[in-house]
Each structure stands twice: as C-alpha cells, then as structure tokens.
Amino acid sequence: MVLYNLILHKKYAKVGTKTSKGEQKMRKGVKVTVLLFSAVLLLGLAACGKKNVQNPQTTAAGSENTAETPAVLKQQIKVAALKGPTAIGMVQLMENAKEQTAKNDYEFQIAATADEFSADLIKGNVALAALPCNAAATLYNKSNGKIRILGINTLGVLSILDTGDSVQTVADLKGKTIYTTGKGTTPEYTLRYLLSSAGLNPDSDVTIEFKSEAAEVAAVMANAGTEEVIAMLPQPYAATVLMQQPDTRIALDVTEEWEKLNGSDSTVVTGVLVVNTEFYKNNRQAVDDFLAEYKSSVQYVNSNVDGAAQLVEDFDIFKAAVAKKAIPKCNITLITGQEMQDKVEKYLKVLCDANPNAVGGQMPDDGFYVK
C-alpha cells in the first residue's frame, strides 16, 4: 500500500485542481494494477520464507538416521575341551566363533588331558569345559563346589580291540595285557568295573598297561606284527586303528557290556559340560546362549558328518577321514536337566561303589547339577 500511495501521489496529486472523469477512470485502473502487483510481491516473499524454514521433525529424523548404531559388545568366554569326542561336538560353534558369528566371543583350548586346564577352571580363568564325567565329580568335591555340571555331551565311546580272535567276552580277558589310557579317570574305572563284574581281579588276573595318550596305544597296535594285542580305546582312536589295520576287530563294545550289567536305564557317561560356579552365577544368559549354540553344533555334527569331519581336521583335532568314520560311533549329544542328573548319578554310583576315589571320595551332592 505504501507503493500504491507513492504512485498516486506522484502522478495525480495537484493541490487546488479537480479531477476529470477520464482521470478518475485512469486512477481506478492504476489502483487495480498496483494491488495485483503487491499481491504477487507478498506471495513471492512468503514462498522464500518457507524455503528457509526446516521441519524440526524431519531434521531430527535425519540426525537419527546418520548417527552410528553402537556395536553390541560380545562377552569373552574361554572354553576348554579334550582332543576327542568332547571337542568334536563343538566344532561348528568353533567355526562360528572364528567367523565372529557366535553370540559370545569364545576362545577355545583343545587339550590332551583335563589336567591342562583343571586349575584354570577352578580359578575361573576357564569359564566352561568339556571333560570326563568322573573328573568333573572329583573337581566338584575337591574344590568345594567351584564347578557345576551343565549337561552330558558324550555317552559311551570305548571299545576293546583285538588283533586276534581270542576275546569274545569280558571273562576272556583273563591273563591278557590290556593297553589303554586314562589312569585315574573314566576309562580305568570303567574297565575295572567290567573286569570285577566278570569275576576277574583287575590287579592280578589281567595286566593293565597305561599310556599317557590314546595315540600311543594306537601306535602299539600298529606295530604289533603277528603278536596279538588287546587295547581299550575311545573313538576316534579306535576308528584310526581299524582303518590302518583291517585285521583288527572290535571285540567288545564297552557300553553294551555296561548295560548288560546295569540295564538299559543306566549307561556310560563319558563326557560332560561344566561351568565355573561363580561365572554361572554372574553370567546366566551367556551360559544359556552357549548351551543353545552347543546344541545347534551337536545337531550339525550328527547330521552333516562330511562337513563336520572337515571342521574336525581344520581345527587340528583329527584327520577328516578318521573323523568321518568315528562320528557315527561317538555318541555325541547334549542332555540337560533332570534326565542329565539321573544318568550321571546312576553312572557315578556304580563307579563310587567300586572305588570312591573314582568320584573324589564321595558322591557329589545335589548342588553339582544345574537344572
């Protein structure tokens, strides 16, 4: 309107003069023109103003989209296992950890004997471990409950091999030398129990020759020549011997012999999963995640033997060809809860009755079991 008044004043304002009809018409035309011009000018200014105003919601959303999502921190957990079936069951989990796709950040230690990590397990430097069932009971008793059992991961894996044909029953072992491993652990106590149940004195009727590792026993059989050699070996060492020496046979399946004596509701429990008690109290979700991933790994191993065998070789546990033969006979599993407790208690009771030292002097109490 200021612009309109200036134009009118400049063109038509003359003091003391009258306005003609023509001039009045001209003024009306100019007035309309100026009004239209002003309207266009105001609309343009408004549009410019809108272009410079940002929607605060849009800006905030944009800021959120550009912000980095914080990385999820995985818990570092050290896991130990023995070089054998107890490690074979977790090879897919080991591969997932290597590829950084596991739920936790796992570090694995594969050992020849449980002695290599038992002290660290009690201290908590090793959080989880797979080891012989009776060794777990012994550690629990001697450490005043500093470890607990989570589940059974391996059932019977022992076989008595014979390069000849003289052994058909346990009683036929009388007067023989038996090569084996695991002095003071499951193999020794299982063998002694079978011998005693057959009426043989393990200390006088047979000679039990212990070697530090199963590979040494396999070497004795490989170098036997024409001499008959008898040995008790776990898988996959038994499979190795059978592959290298076609004339060697499985004379006795230790699990079958055990069940003949105790019924099918009692079986050999070779390996178990245990956890440091303090770690379990403070990290239950991490332990649950481990068990879920371990179960998945066991299912993979049992249903994809070729792929699992290759992973066994990749992690320097055994050659793939040996693992392929052994896995179907390894009884790899994961049994938890009440079923786990029932099987472990029955197995340990047999060992404890035969020799209390086999389980650390006494049966472990109910606190041993995570249910």
Question: For the regions a protein language model found, what residue spans apply to each?
Answer:
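Short, Lys/Arg-enriched N-terminal segments with co-localized hydrophobic residues
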Residues: 1-25
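Bacterial signal peptide processing site
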Residues: 49-51
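Pocket-lining segment of extracytoplasmic ligand-binding domains
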Residues: 134-135, 143, 215-311
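Short, glycine-/small- and polar/acidic-enriched structural segments
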Residues: 55-210, 235, 251-252
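A bilobed periplasmic-binding-protein/Venus flytrap-type ligand-binding module shared by bacterial periplasmic
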Residues: 92-94, 158-168, 267-286, 333
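Conserved C-terminal helix/tail region of periplasmic/extracytoplasmic solute-binding proteins
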Residues: 345-371
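Secondary-structure end/capping motifs
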Residues: 280-354
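C-terminal motif of bacterial Sec signal peptides marking the signal peptidase cleavage site
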Residues: 44-47
